[in-house]
Swiss-Prot record:
Cofactor: pyridoxal 5'-phosphate
Example GO BP: D-alanine biosynthetic process
Superkingdom as given in the UniProt entry: Bacteria
Database matches in InterPro entries: Ala_racemase, Ala_racemase/Decarboxylase_C, Ala_racemase_C, Ala_racemase_N, PLP-binding_barrel
Reaction(s) this enzyme catalyzes, per UniProt: L-alanine = D-alanine
GO CC field: cytosol
Alphabetized GO MF terms: alanine racemase activity; pyridoxal phosphate binding
Name of the protein in its database record: Alanine racemase
Keyword Isomerase: yes
Primary enzyme class: isomerase
Keywords: Isomerase, Pyridoxal phosphate
Role: Catalyzes the interconversion of L-alanine and D-alanine. May also act on other amino acids.
Length: 365
């Protein structure tokens, strides 16, 4: 059985640290992609009293949040109109991505005789989604004056927040500042928000009314220097499995698909029942590490869909069937932390955690 063990205490402590850091700004906690792989329901249930909003990517994720908490939920993605009636009935916040969305939402709201809560996404430079910057004020004005929309927020997203010295950050901030000025001229109550984790840590003065710290809440820090208080944030999860078999190789024998790993005489291997079918990175095969009884062991051979093997050498530490295997550590400096795994596989921690699928059990401890 493979288990992602999540520390409730660490999770809640991370959020408290962030709240202290952002001062009076509201906190919108992103729980998209199954709470970055940690499990939406468990994460929401254990944090709803600490945050102001939750944020997700689509309608189906939003419904999972509203099933366990009463906090406002913002959907970042496009509006799927097949779900819009349920979204409106549950007061889920939609993101207006272009001017035409307003008329569509008004028509549906009239039919339901219920107003729609909306945030307007403005494209200030990421050039992916959102209302064009040059059309922002017209769209904001139109939504604000609508009898059927409650314009709750206006937001944008930084394209290069992970590089705090990138000139695009200043360009986007300046554009957003002009939008904030226009918006606040309509109403001081409209929530303006721009920053994700890297945004408010790397750039001063861009917390605005609300921040959206996703990866930071789960315990992953940017590599650039951050405040000493933020350094107290820690990863909240460990991925664990069990040794299910010990095998002994003779010299020249191989293991796994294509037998690319060749053992030495009397080398012992431990078989671990987790593979890329569980969302664990296949690229780790033959180069990753796992922790068994506080000793690091290298993976041996190709990872399969349902399993991997690690070399125990001559097994001088007496690893046995049933011993716990730590595949992802909550200690960032360890060779099997999400940070280290991301470096080994040329990706980011978000990817490592969010691809862990439902074959892995989530357990809050």
């Amino acid at each position: 059985m493979n288990i992602l063990k999540i520390s409730k205490q660490t999770l809640r402590n991370n959020i408290k640290i962030i709240r202290e850091y952002i001062g009076n700004a509201k906190m919108c906690f992103p729980v998209k992609a199954n709470a970055y792989g940690h499990g939406i329901e468990d994460i929401v249930e254990n944090t709803h009293d600490l945050v102001d909003f939750f944020a997700v990517a689509n309608s189906l994720e939003a419904f999972r949040v509203t099933a366990v908490a009463k906090n406002p939920v913002l959907v970042f993605g496009v509006i799927y109109y097949e779900y819009i009636e349920k979204m409106i009935s549950e007061n889920i916040r939609v993101s207006i991505q272009d001017y035409e969305d307003i008329e569509k939402l008004e028509q549906i709201a009239k039919e339901l005789d219920k107003k729609v809560y909306a945030h307007i996404n403005i494209n200030t430079g990421m050039n992916r989604m959102g209302v064009d910057y040059n059309d922002a004020c017209r769209t904001i004005q139109r939504a604000y004056e609508s009898d059927w929309l409650i314009l709750e927020g206006v937001y944008s997203h930084l394209a290069c927040a992970d590089n705090r010295d990138h000139p695009t950050n200043i360009k986007q901030k300046n554009r957003f500042d002009s939008i904030v000025k226009f918006t606040k001229g309509l109403s001081q109550d409209i929530i303006c928000h721009l920053s994700n984790s890297y945004g408010f840590l790397g750039q001063k003065g861009i917390c605005y009314d609300m921040v959206r710290p996703g990866i930071l809440s789960y315990g992953f820090l940017p590599e650039f220097y951050v405040d000493r208080v933020i350094r107290e944030i820690k990863p909240i999860a460990r991925l664990l499995s069990k040794v299910v078999k010990i095998i002994t190789l003779q010299e020249g024998e191989g293991v796994g698909y294509s037998l690319i790993y060749r053992g030495f005489e009397d080398e012992q291997l431990a078989v671990i029942p987790i593979g890329y079918g569980d969302g664990f990175p296949r690229e780790l095969g033959d180069r990753g590490f796992v922790n068994i009884n506080d000793v690091m062991y290298p993976m041996a051979g190709r990872m399969s869909m349902d399993g991997l093997t690690v070399s125990l050498g001559i097994n001088e530490y007496d690893v046995k069937v049933g011993d716990t295997v730590e595949l992802i550590s909550a200690i960032p400096r360890n060779r099997n932390s999400a940070f280290s795994i991301a470096k080994q596989t040329n990706t980011i921690e978000y990817d490592i955690m969010s691809t862990l699928n439902d074959r892995i059990i989530r357990k809050i401890i």
